[in-house]
Structure formats: C-alpha cells, structure tokens
UniProtKB/Swiss-Prot annotation:
Protein's job: Binds to actin and affects the structure of the cytoskeleton. At high concentrations, profilin prevents the polymerization of actin, whereas it enhances it at low concentrations. By binding to PIP2, it inhibits the formation of IP3 and DG.
Assembly behavior: Occurs in many kinds of cells as a complex with monomeric actin in a 1:1 ratio.
Keywords of the record: Actin-binding, Cytoplasm, Cytoskeleton
Name of the molecule in the record: Profilin-3
Length: 133
C-alpha cells in the first residue's frame, strides 16, 4: 500500500457517513520530508518540524510558545509525552502522532471534533508502529 493510500483512505475518512472529514492530513518523515499529504495540507517551514520533533524529545518544549505549522499558531493541549502532540486554534486543531520513522498529522475544523481527529491519527499511527514504521 502506498503512503498516499494511508492518507486518502485512512486519514481523510468520512466520519460516521456524515460527509465530515479532516481539513488536511499528511505523513512526514522525522526529517520533515513529505511521504504523502492531502491536497490542502499547509506548506510548513522546516524549523516548525524541527520544533515539533524537539517537543517529542523534550515534552513541554512547545507549551510556552505554542505549536506552529505553516505560520499558524496552535495552543498546545494535553497529549502523550513522546508520542502524541495535540493543539487547538479556535474551532479547529491539530493532532500529531510520532511513530518510529514518521509523523502523522491531522488537522480539523468544526463540525469534526478533537476526539474524531485524535482517533484516526492515533489509530493509523499505532498501526504503523506495529508494522515497524
């Protein structure tokens, strides 16, 4: 299965048949290389990925400044140290799951809920960890 298939078929899913999807999703390498992405995934800066990786290595690193992706600031909210970072901005937010080799990104806007975003991002992340990725 291609990385793009994981994004298209497992991250950009229709929640409960309601026609609701994540706003954007992507799978990146730890170095910030894009393995696959949805059409609306934002153009990020390399230093933003560096800072995200630093927060996985040093949980709490992003809390004082916020998480930035494509220049957009998200307030960091509860996550799983070293495994999941979650952020909130207005009626939307972001979930990032770290695997051995990849970062799984999900961005959402209402009516999609934080829980729905967390579920799909973390589910595919856990699957990839089980597969050695």
């Amino acid at each position: 299965m291609s990385w793009q298939t994981y994004v298209d078929d497992h991250l950009m899913v229709d929640f409960e048949g309601q026609g609701q999807h994540l706003a954007a999703a992507a799978i990146l390498g730890h170095d910030g290389s894009v393995w696959a992405q949805s059409p609306h995934f934002p153009k990020f800066k390399p230093e933003e990925i560096t800072n995200i990786m630093k927060d996985f290595d040093e949980p709490g690193f992003l809390a004082p400044t916020g998480l930035f992706l494509a220049g957009i600031k998200y307030m960091v909210i509860q996550g799983e140290p070293g495994a999941v970072i979650r952020g909130k901005k207005g009626s939307g937010g972001i979930t990032i799951k770290k695997t051995n080799q990849a970062l799984i990104f999900g961005l959402y806007e209402e009516p999609v809920t934080p829980g729905q975003c967390n579920m799909v991002v973390e589910k595919i992340g856990d699957y990839l960890v089980d597969q050695g990725y």
